[in-house]
């Protein structure tokens, strides 16, 4: 299930909003010194400014058959309301069919990609984005972030920010030792009618970065 945590107006459908998992992100003193580290073993993301953690959050990683790439990268693109170019839905009137962009179910359908909010790309077709943070490898190589952490991560990541992805990170022994993790990964998927609409993208200003003490 992909958690979007979107709230509608009265009379509309309401999706569950989970507040138990809510990592705190802090503004950097020098944005040019920010580094993003990913531990595949512990499935954790550490956004660091020197030795100071700005955001520590769980992530979902790629399947063994579609692994998250390891290496040293840099942020190359950011799109707050990105949709997948590969996976999504085919729409014709009130009919919505899940599928891939390469295979339409018939004539007259239009393709709408799956929402990948707060997209932060570090390699062509690979990036961080909102999604269910499963405790086991689950993605096609991208790194999913919880809705309550993705906005802050998006604010911290700038074009050119270094991204280091490795099996382990030094921070695993301290920041990543028994961290809280989200438990809402198995929530039911939102309705397809929501996922194809602009309402799939939630922008919550309460998730802004905080000032460092």
Task: Give the ranges of each region predicted by the language model.
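Bacterial N-terminal signal peptides
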Residues: 1-10
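Alpha-helical hydrophobic/aromatic positions enriched in membrane-embedded helices and signal peptides
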Residues: 3, 31, 138-139
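Exported/periplasmic cell-wall-interacting domains
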Residues: 12, 16-17, 24, 70, ...
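Post-signal peptide N-terminal segment of mature Sec-exported envelope proteins
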Residues: 18-48
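Glycine-rich catalytic cores of cysteine/serine-nucleophile enzymes that process amide/ester linkages
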Residues: 40-44, 48-79
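Short, charged beta-turn/beta-strand-edge "cap" motif at the junction between a beta-strand
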Residues: 51, 81, 169-172
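Short, charged/polar surface micro-motifs in flexible loops or helix N-caps
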Residues: 80-82, 125
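Non-transmembrane, membrane-adjacent beta-strand/coil modules in membrane-associated proteins
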Residues: 83-87
